[in-house]
């Protein structure tokens, strides 16, 4: 192979590599929003959880940014506005609802399209203010929600 042929071969190979990289970049750019990793959620309620009361718990799966922006910042606010939010969100939100008594272990039944969710949030109607904040569990694959006497903790095994 002479120098000129080698130069053309090298230029052509360089062009092919650049075109391939451009296509790969475009595919990842146009693939849409990143989806949630959540595939398993377990709830463990300790004996005296939520002042020995059953805990109303909603795991909210959101499918677009507009619906995510409408979510309240606390559990009590979520439960107060839940009906209106669901009516206005149409197909943008799925909810897995549980009523968890103390001394209980429960698996959360995930909605059929959970793998397409762009966000997953936990709302609890806890008596103590320390258990009322919304929790974003979107990036975690496996989540255990611990309901304790004083609040809620999350474990990501």
Give the positions of each predicted feature.
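Early exported N-terminus immediately downstream of N-terminal targeting peptides
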Residues: 41-76
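Bacterial N-terminal signal peptides that target proteins for export
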Residues: 2-17
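Tryptophan-paired
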Residues: 73-113
């Amino acid at each position: 192979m002479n120098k000129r042929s080698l130069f053309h071969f090298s230029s052509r190979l360089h062009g092919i590599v650049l075109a391939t990289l451009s296509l790969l970049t475009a595919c990842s750019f146009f693939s849409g929003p990143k989806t949630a990793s959540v595939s398993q959620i377990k709830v463990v309620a300790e004996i005296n959880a939520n002042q020995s009361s059953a805990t109303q718990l909603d795991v909210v799966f959101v499918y677009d940014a507009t619906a995510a922006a409408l979510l309240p910042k606390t559990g009590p606010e979520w439960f107060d506005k839940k009906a209106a939010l669901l009516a206005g969100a149409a197909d943008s939100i799925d909810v897995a609802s549980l009523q968890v008594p103390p001394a209980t272990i429960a698996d959360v039944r995930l909605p059929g399209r959970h793998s397409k969710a762009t966000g997953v949030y936990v709302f609890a109607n806890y008596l103590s203010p320390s258990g009322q904040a919304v929790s974003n569990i979107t990036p975690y694959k496996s989540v255990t929600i611990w309901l304790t006497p004083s609040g809620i903790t999350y474990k990501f095994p």
